[in-house]
Amino acid sequence: MISDKIKLTAKDILEKEFKTGMRGYQQEEVDKFLDMIIKDYEAFHKEFEQLKQQNARLKRELEEQKLAVTQVPQQPVQTPVAQPVYNNTNTDILKRLSNLEKAVFGSKLYE
């Protein structure tokens, strides 16, 4: 992620104070700080370019999907043919069978 690569914030740059030596700022300290700034800007630029490429790719894919959707021929939706509805479930059938057995064989089955 980009925040992992960036070491400085705008506030860090604004508030950075360099120690002054006998003849002004310590050149090594300024150079190190500027090197960090350069690395941050390079990281920003690289991330920005990657995001631009990703954005362009996603826009192309979106346009392709839109085109594919508009080119699909519109077919009428067929409603399924109504199947005969049987209200007899397995439990109903078992109850009826049990009642028939009782009627035919009487209580002999259950002794």
UniProtKB/Swiss-Prot annotation:
Cellular localisation: Cytoplasm
Coiled-coil positions: 38-72
Gene Ontology BP terms: cell division; peptidoglycan-based cell wall biogenesis; regulation of cell shape
Domain of life: Bacteria
Keywords, in A-Z order: Cell cycle, Cell division, Cell shape, Coiled coil, Cytoplasm
Functional description taken from the UniProt entry: Divisome component that associates with the complex late in its assembly, after the Z-ring is formed, and is dependent on DivIC and PBP2B for its recruitment to the divisome. Together with EzrA, is a key component of the system that regulates PBP1 localization during cell cycle progression. Its main role could be the removal of PBP1 from the cell pole after pole maturation is completed. Also contributes to the recruitment of PBP1 to the division complex. Not essential for septum formation.
Sequence similarity: Belongs to the GpsB family.
Protein name: Cell cycle protein GpsB
Originating gene: gpsB
